[in-house]
Design a protein with these regions (language model features):
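Catalytic core of nucleotide-sugar-dependent glycosyltransferases
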Residues: 1-244
Length: 244
């Protein structure tokens, strides 16, 4: 794609991911720092982290199905339920009856978490996500395989790419592409954690992690940044940069 755009005379220099340096938390939601201490007590690569980002909203029924799917999977889980994920519902109202008491030994529910810290934690074995691009990049950087459940805009395209790259397992919601069902959530988790397909996805994601880090340290991202700086210098001196 980059080469095709350049052939059309478009100046493009891909850089990133850009969240690594000088990252400042921008969310107004209070973060559950205690979740990191909880993760410290879990086995390596055992926890399913489930979060739908800062903007996506889902129905009360789907939150119930998601929660029950996590429960039925028998995996430890960290579930994020934003205050506005389901309108007019508190965390306790948004979850199935007695869910918190039934899962307190192997699950944690938070309103918001420090996602980069969570994804870099050794205990995380998979990330159940809406496939927003920020979450996707953060997961790739940390080598955490994805369970994809896109909701809107570019997220379906993102998941299609991730599945084609063999770094994600989709939650198969059928033609409707919206309604979560607990058995489908459980099936996707089991596929990632216990099947040969899941093993391939985990292995491939670790390869993507290395590619991303090489791009930042000495690869395309670094060379693109250096080229951009050089082009700006040339223009400041009244010279014609390479892309013109």
């Amino acid at each position: 794609i980059v080469h095709a755009l350049r052939d059309e005379g478009i100046a493009i220099d891909p850089m990133g991911p850009l969240f690594l340096k000088g990252h400042k938390r921008a969310s107004l939601l209070s973060e559950d720092g205690g979740c990191l201490e909880w993760l410290d007590k879990q086995m390596s690569s055992s926890v399913i982290y489930a979060s739908f980002g800062s903007n996506v909203k889902i129905s009360l029924e789907e939150v119930h199905e998601l929660a029950l799917g996590l429960e039925d999977s028998q995996q430890p889980f960290l579930l994020v339920i934003r205050p506005d994920l389901v309108l007019d519902n508190t965390i306790s109202d948004a979850l199935p009856t007695d869910f918190l008491s039934r899962t307190k030994e192997r699950g944690r529910v938070s309103t918001w978490v420090p996602q980069l810290d969570v994804l870099s934690h050794d205990a995380i074995g998979g990330f159940l996500t809406h496939c927003g691009w920020n979450s996707t990049l953060e997961s790739i950087w940390n080598g955490k395989p994805l369970i994809g459940c896109p909701r809107e805009s570019e997220q379906n395209t993102n998941l299609k790419c991730l599945v084609d790259w063999n770094v994600a397992i989709p939650v198969d919601v059928g033609k409707n592409k919206v309604n979560l069902k607990k058995d489908l959530v459980t099936k996707a988790i089991h596929k990632l954690m216990y099947t040969s397909e899941g093993q391939r996805v985990r292995k491939k994601m670790l390869e993507f992690k290395e590619v991303a880090r090489c791009a930042m340290e000495s690869g395309h991202s670094r060379s693109s940044l250096n080229k951009l700086v050089q082009d700006i210098k040339e223009m400041s001196l009244g010279r014609k940069p390479d892309f013109l």
